[in-house]
């Protein structure tokens, strides 16, 4: 097959850039960026990268914490395969020029919810930005890597039952074209923009996951949408809610309700350090009992210099955007969509059920996260699986997953009861508000059946897309329906999925 490149990567986050830098320099590599190279969800990551690095920690402890957070639905073999590469991943990032915070013992490690010890390597509270800056600098030095900005991947091209490239939209001209490749990699992030309140940037419209569904790839665990407990309870900027890092609680931050009472000890023995799903539901429950739509996160009991040193970007943002000095005042917070725990099913090397197609990062479902992601495991997963993927591609290894049985999209008799109550008019804000209500942190059978019926109607009535925005809307609908169907099929409250009727 005549190709335009050896490896075609749709996405420009941490997993995508790690893969490009880990492949042999003899490979012709193309990176498709929907926006700019430096505009990606990875850049907004605050907390850090979890790895068993210190003398008091070991891989078994990290595995145990990950399995507990995943609520029994992790793939333990995948967990061990990925976490065992934590230390080499940190060493690789150091070699790329990432300047992690240090102290007299070496790397300064912080602790976050669900972790039983300090194991989070970080750069203050802007780890993602620091890591991406270092990797972008390395990318620009590689003549074999071609970066194409403002190019949106639309659909997977196949030949003889294997992926052979992508159909692409030039977002500047709205023209479509094809790129043929020996290996195709989807690393376009999650589907956070199906919600009205999310920490993800506007580009996270589920493009890669939607493409995979249309191509018949196996997907899984899409019902497990992680809501971060502490999004800043202020109007969002450019469709993205500002995140108050898990590490604020890891360094002693206390959650209080409208009455000024600390409430987390009533919900879990780990209090503020419980896994995200537990803390998020606890906050939602407290908000439901009070008049204000937020709770307070207070770190002001720590020395002001400590707060400014550990959380400079949070301190700066709250002060400049909200007039809030977190060294003296509590931060108003509420749960916000943050991470897609499921995605395209892969092995730890990123191989999907479609030959020559790989998926990495938040786009993928490796089995590491199970029903709920442990804080700071996602950046680790990006680096480790991308490096393993590079090795698999270079070695020409093959992989075949189990066939994917796509759920029927015909309206059920139960869903039909909403036929007189459905909206014909579609817009992205209407979709996002609808999903926030019915596919949010607290779900029920009636809401999920209504969601499936409404989303199917919108999807059936959708016109053929021609512009970037229209293609994004197609993907948002595809992903929304997949989440709703997966959530309705899950008859067990576990991890990030909670249905009050189960």
UniProtKB/Swiss-Prot annotation:
- Entry GO MF terms: L-aspartate oxidase activity; nucleotide binding
- Write down the EC number: 1.4.3.16
- Alphabetic keyword roster: Cytoplasm, FAD, Flavoprotein, Nucleotide-binding, Oxidoreductase, Pyridine nucleotide biosynthesis
List cofactor names only.
FAD
| Top-level taxon | Bacteria
What Pfam families does the entry give? FAD_binding_2 (PF00890)
Main enzyme class: oxidoreductase
Q: Looking at the UniProt record for this protein, which Gene Ontology cellular component terms does it annotate, in alphabetical order?
A: cytoplasm
Q: Where is this site: Important in orienting the L-aspartate substrate?
A: 112
Q: Does the keyword Flavoprotein apply?
A: yes
Active-site residues from the entry: 276
Keyword Transmembrane appears in the UniProt entry: no
* Locations listed in the record: Cytoplasm
Q: What is this protein called?
A: L-aspartate oxidase
Species for this entry:
Neisseria meningitidis serogroup B (strain ATCC BAA-335 / MC58)
This chain is encoded by the gene named nadB
């Amino acid at each position: 097959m005549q190709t335009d490149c050896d490896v075609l990567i749709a996405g420009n986050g941490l997993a995508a850039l790690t893969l490009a830098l880990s492949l042999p320099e003899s490979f012709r590599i193309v990176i498709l960026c929907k926006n700019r190279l430096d505009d990606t969800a990875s850049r907004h990551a605050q907390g850090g990268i979890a790895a068993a690095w210190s003398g008091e920690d070991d891989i078994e402890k990290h595995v145990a914490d990950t399995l507990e957070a995943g609520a029994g639905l992790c793939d333990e073999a995948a967990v061990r395969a990925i976490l065992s590469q934590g230390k080499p991943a940190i060493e690789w990032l150091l070699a790329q020029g990432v300047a992690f915070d240090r102290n007299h013992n070496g790397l300064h490690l912080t602790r976050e919810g669900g972790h039983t010890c300090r194991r989070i390597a970080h750069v203050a509270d802007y780890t993602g930005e620091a890591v991406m800056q270092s990797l972008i600098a390395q990318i620009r030095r590689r003549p074999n890597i071609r970066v194409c900005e403002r190019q949106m991947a639309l659909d997977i091209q196949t030949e003889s039952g294997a992926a052979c490239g992508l159909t692409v939209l030039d977002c500047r001209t709205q023209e479509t074209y094809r790129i043929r490749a020996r290996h195709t990699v989807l690393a376009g992030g999650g589907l956070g923009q199906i919600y009205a309140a999310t920490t993800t940037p506007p580009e996270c419209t589920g493009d890669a996951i939607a493409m995979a569904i249309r191509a018949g790839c196996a997907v899984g665990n899409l019902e497990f949408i992680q809501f971060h407990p502490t999004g800043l309870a202020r109007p969002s900027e450019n469709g993205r809610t500002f995140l108050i890092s898990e590490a604020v609680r890891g360094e002693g931050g206390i959650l209080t309700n409208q009455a000024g009472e600390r409430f987390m000890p009533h919900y879990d023995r780990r209090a503020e350090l419980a896994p995200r799903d537990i803390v998020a539901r606890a906050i939602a429950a407290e908000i439901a009992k009070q008049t204000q739509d937020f709770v307070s996160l207070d770190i002001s009991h720590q020395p002001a210099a400590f707060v400014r040193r550990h959380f400079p970007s949070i301190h700066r943002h709250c002060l400049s955007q909200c007039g809030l000095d977190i060294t003296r005042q509590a931060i108003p917070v509420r749960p916000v969509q943050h991470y897609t725990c499921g995605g395209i099913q892969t092995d730890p090397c990123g191989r999907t059920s479609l030959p020559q197609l790989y998926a990495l990062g938040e786009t993928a479902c490796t089995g590491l996260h199970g029903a709920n992601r442990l804080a700071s495991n996602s950046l680790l997963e990006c680096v480790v699986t991308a490096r393993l993927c590079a090795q698999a591609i270079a070695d020409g290894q093959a992989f075949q997953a189990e066939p994917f049985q796509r759920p029927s999209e015909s309206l059920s008799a139960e869903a039909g009861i909403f036929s007189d109550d459905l909206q014909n008019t579609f817009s992205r804000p209407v979709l996002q508000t609808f999903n926030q209500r019915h596919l949010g942190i607290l779900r029920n059978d009636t809401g999920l059946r209504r969601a499936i019926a409404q989303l199917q109607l919108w999807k059936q009535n959708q016109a053929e897309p021609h512009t970037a925005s229209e293609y994004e809307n197609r993907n948002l609908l595809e992903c929304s329906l997949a989440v709703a169907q997966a959530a309705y099929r899950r008859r067990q409250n576990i991890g990030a999925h909670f249905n009050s009727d189960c």
